[in-house]
């Protein structure tokens, strides 16, 4: 897939709408008001967002999600915050490895989700990290260079 101009704000908006359809009880909001554009692979970026939302709901029991994108001189930062049970700090790095599953994960899963997230971040020349969220759960932070 080629790198094309992607409107990240619009991508997050669509992901939010689809998430509410998949999880009717979920409160999903988008923090970004300004348009954030970058060169990227839309399908891959969308996969990352959908994955973070699914993880938050299935494994963290999240009821609230906040999506955000910010652009700066350093590039673009996309964050997915949730109010779920969170991922213990000592496991935040390991869960990105293939087939790894966090000790707090509630349902069976392939354990491939976050490995795919890490792979997409790498393909975009950036990084993916799990952090503590201001909402009380987990924050997935995707930090990508704006241009490739």
Predicted regions and their residues:
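Glycine-rich ATP-binding loops of the HATPase_c
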Residues: 125-131
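Short conserved segment of the HATPase_c
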Residues: 87-99
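Short beta-strand/loop element within the Bergerat-fold HATPase_c
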Residues: 64-74
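Short helix-loop "hinge" at the ATP-lid/N-box region of the Bergerat-fold HATPase_c
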Residues: 56-60
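Short alpha-helical Gxxx[C/S/T] motif in the catalytic ATP-binding
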Residues: 113, 117
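Acidic ATP/Mg2+-coordinating residue in the GHKL
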Residues: 82
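Conserved catalytic submotifs in the C-terminal HATPase_c
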Residues: 4, 25-37, 135
């Amino acid at each position: 897939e080629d790198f094309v101009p992607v409107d990240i704000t619009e991508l997050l908006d669509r992901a939010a709408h689809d998430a509410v359809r998949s999880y009717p009880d979920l409160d999903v909001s988008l923090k970004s008001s300004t348009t954030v554009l970058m060169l990227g692979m839309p399908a891959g970026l969308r996969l990352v967002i959908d994955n973070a939302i699914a993880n938050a709901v299935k494994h963290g029991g999240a009821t609230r999600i906040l999506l955000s994108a910010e652009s700066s001189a350093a590039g673009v930062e996309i964050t997915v915050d949730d109010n779920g049970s969170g991922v213990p700090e000592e496991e935040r790095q390991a869960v990105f490895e293939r087939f790894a599953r966090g000790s707090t994960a509630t349902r069976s899963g392939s354990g491939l989700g976050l490995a795919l997230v890490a792979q997409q971040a790498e393909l975009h020349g950036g990084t993916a990290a799990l952090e503590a969220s201001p909402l009380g759960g987990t924050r997935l932070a995707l930090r990508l260079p704006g241009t490739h």
